[in-house]
Amino acid sequence: MLINADVNDDYVMLVGVSSDALNALAEFTKQVYQDLEINVKSITINTQVSLVDAVLMLRGMIEGNAPCDVVIGIAGDRWVTTVLSFLAMALVTVGGFVNVSVDKVFTMPSDKGEPVDWPIVPRLIDLSPVEFRVLRLICSGYSLAKEIVKGYASRFNEAISLPTVERTLAKLRSKRLVNGKPVGKALMHETTELGKLIACG
């Protein structure tokens, strides 16, 4: 991945499951980009972690460099290909909310032919800004509608009504981004794996 950050230095992020192969590739990449002063970071993905956790780690690193533009080149084994594909789709889904733009995604064929550009990077789901903010609050531990109203005002400096939060939670449940568990007369919310993939971290 090539991360072109507005604030921090530009860098190439190499992702794989073998640290030896990544180190060799990192040395090669440093030579290719030596005149451009681009940093190279090698990230080894543990194949024992879940898909969601692997994507969360990478998404968090990229969002930590926002605002930025990202180019994702996909090659390697099935695990890396799957993780990077979901990363691309997650970033496109929430990029507008976190100042990350996915400029290009391409796949390198195993026969070492020409790269194949993705004609479109699909969104995992459509979200409004309010839905994304509420989902982020749930990731942060706000689980009841009344808590979310208070958390929304303190985190985003913007008031939101309880009925609006309740409608938003209903939409998030229908999109299978959160689950609601009855606690007395209220519903306690937690993210699903998909909700975690796109908003937590």
Predicted regions and their residues:
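Polyanion-engaging groove/track-forming segments
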Residues: 79
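Short N-terminal targeting/anchoring amphipathic segment
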Residues: 68-76
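Long, low-complexity, Lys/Arg-enriched
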Residues: 1-69, 83-86, 90-201
